[in-house]
């Protein structure tokens, strides 16, 4: 063999060896890259307070607030406060739907009001939720707290009769009763021994522990798809004293309303501790039951507030629960890789004694007009705080308009994935804002009062298609420039008819398109109730 042939052979061997080494290296790198993302992805903890007003958080209301919230402010000092953040609705279930799906609730059957007692699920089984999205990408997902989005209760029409005509502070369709009949109790035992379908564990969550609604039956905890214990006594009306919007119904013997919030805190801390010990990132959705009625303040927190009001005590207890969650994250040594999001489902409820609070110098809506259920800002402008160490600058604020629907797109971008066209139709990622950009991310944000009055916000302009509070009335339209009039004191609809027409047409387009973000046109579940009418 000649020298040239030997050299050629030698070079061929070297090339073959190099190729083998490159293949081995590629396989190793590919395997490593595949293994790294699940570990590197941040944990996500979403804390949703219930009926906590914009002015109930001390960092949002330093001059007109009298309730200290040091633990919520602790999140703010380590992250970003959004000053123009909104829930999708002025009340409960609609906001929960929108937060979990990234889609406005008024695209569903819920054109007004909330999901009722024993009602079917509002989230369609095939609808992607933030939990389902996270689960697709290797997350363990848990929900601890108030669900209030409906279940597939296995209850026949005949059995439903045993659950009707009980009273309470909100009426409930009947007078207050002192006890249930023997026949009713037997039916209850049968109903609540069955599995309950259609809840959180069928909507993307691996586990669930909580109460469906703390002021409605059944008065028991639900774990995954079963009641914890069998509600077999009638909750006495005395337990609901001074707790508006609460109903009598089946309860566990010795059920204590003031034990609910501590139990949820215990379970949430346990979830964090357990999940932090695994190789999986986790998403914890913690919809608290407070400070919503029943104002069930634990004994240790009664009388703690300086203004001597049970609601103030309950807000302070709620704040302490937030502190327990933050402590659990730190004790589990995952704080540096955990996104904490804190917000509220709507504004403070006027019926908890707002006039007394304001007389004592505490204004639950701060500088805003209105309260829970309203289309006014006080109904849906809420605290919204995000902490993400090494990603979000501490102690910062953002003035851009955002909404609770934005969690879906935000989480998708954190995961590095693109949402399908039929998911998160109204959601826009907050990451640009969290990284310090200062620009509008929404063409418009839509609000709705609890009765069903729609309102649209674009830039500083807000158009309410009816009165700011109370029943739907198509004869009214109210236009405000919030940059000049945050308190919504001067209606500009007569002075700027062109802006009224512009925003009305924009609202129509958002309805017809089935989405408010770029993407393929989608269908609403029902015909959206929108009739601007002929305003006077």
Residue spans of the language-model regions?
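N-terminal secretory signal peptides that target proteins for export/translocation
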Residues: 1-14
């Amino acid at each position: 063999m000649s020298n040239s042939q030997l050299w050629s052979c030698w070079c061929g061997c070297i090339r073959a060896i190099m190729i083998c080494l490159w293949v081995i290296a590629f396989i190793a790198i590919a395997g490593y890259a595949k293994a790294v993302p699940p570990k590197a992805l941040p944990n996500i903890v979403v804390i949703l307070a219930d009926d906590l007003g914009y002015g109930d958080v001390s960092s949002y209301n330093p001059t007109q607030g009298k309730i200290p919230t040091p633990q919520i402010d602790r999140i703010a000092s380590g992250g970003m406060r959004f000053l123009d953040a909104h829930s999708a609705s002025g009340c409960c279930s609609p906001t929960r739907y929108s937060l979990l799906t990234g889609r406005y609730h008024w695209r569903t059957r819920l054109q007004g009001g909330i999901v009722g007692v024993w009602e079917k699920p509002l989230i369609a089984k095939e609808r992607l939720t933030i939990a389902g999205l996270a689960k697709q990408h290797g997350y363990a997902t848990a929900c601890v707290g108030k669900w209030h989005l409906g279940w597939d209760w296995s209850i026949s029409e005949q059995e439903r009769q045993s659950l009707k005509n009980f009273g309470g502070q909100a009426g409930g369709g009947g007078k207050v009763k002192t006890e249930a009949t023997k026949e009713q109790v037997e039916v209850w035992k049968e109903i609540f021994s069955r599995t309950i379908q259609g809840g959180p564990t069928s909507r993307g969550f691996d586990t669930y522990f909580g109460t469906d609604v703390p002021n409605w039956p059944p008065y028991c905890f639900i774990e995954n798809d079963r009641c914890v214990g069998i509600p077999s006594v009638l909750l006495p009306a005395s337990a609901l004293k001074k707790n508006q919007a609460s109903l009598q119904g089946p309860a566990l013997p010795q059920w204590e309303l003031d034990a609910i919030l501590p139990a949820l805190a215990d379970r949430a801390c346990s979830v964090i501790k357990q999940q932090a010990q695994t190789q999986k990132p986790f998403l914890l959705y913690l919809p608290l039951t407070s400070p919503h009625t029943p104002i069930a303040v634990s004994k240790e927190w009664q009388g703690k507030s300086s203004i001597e009001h049970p609601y103030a005590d309950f807000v302070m207890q709620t704040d302490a629960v937030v502190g327990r969650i933050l402590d659990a994250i730190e004790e589990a040594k995952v704080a540096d890789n955990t996104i904490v999001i804190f917000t509220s489902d709507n504004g403070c409820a006027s019926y908890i004694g707002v006039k007394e609070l304001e007389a004592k110098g505490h204004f639950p809506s701060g500088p805003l007009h209105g309260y829970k259920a309203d289309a006014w800002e006080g109904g849906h402008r809420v605290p919204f705080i995000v902490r993400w160490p090494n990603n979000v600058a501490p102690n910062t604020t953002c003035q851009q308009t955002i909404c609770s629907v934005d969690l879906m797109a935000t989480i998708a971008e954190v995961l590095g994935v693109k949402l399908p066209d039929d998911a998160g139709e109204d959601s826009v990622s907050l990451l640009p804002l969290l990284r310090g950009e200062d620009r509008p991310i929404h063409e418009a944000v839509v609000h709705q009062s609890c009765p069903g009055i729609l309102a649209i916000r674009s830039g500083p302009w807000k158009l309410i298609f009816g009165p700011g509070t109370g029943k739907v009335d198509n004869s009214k339209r109210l236009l405000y420039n919030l940059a000049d009039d945050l308190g919504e004191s001067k209606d500009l609809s007569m002075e700027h008819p062109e802006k009224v027409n512009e925003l009305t047409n924009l609202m129509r387009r958002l309805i017809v398109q089935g989405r408010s973000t770029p993407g393929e046109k989608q269908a609403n579940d029902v015909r959206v109730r929108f009739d601007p009418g002929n305003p006077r």
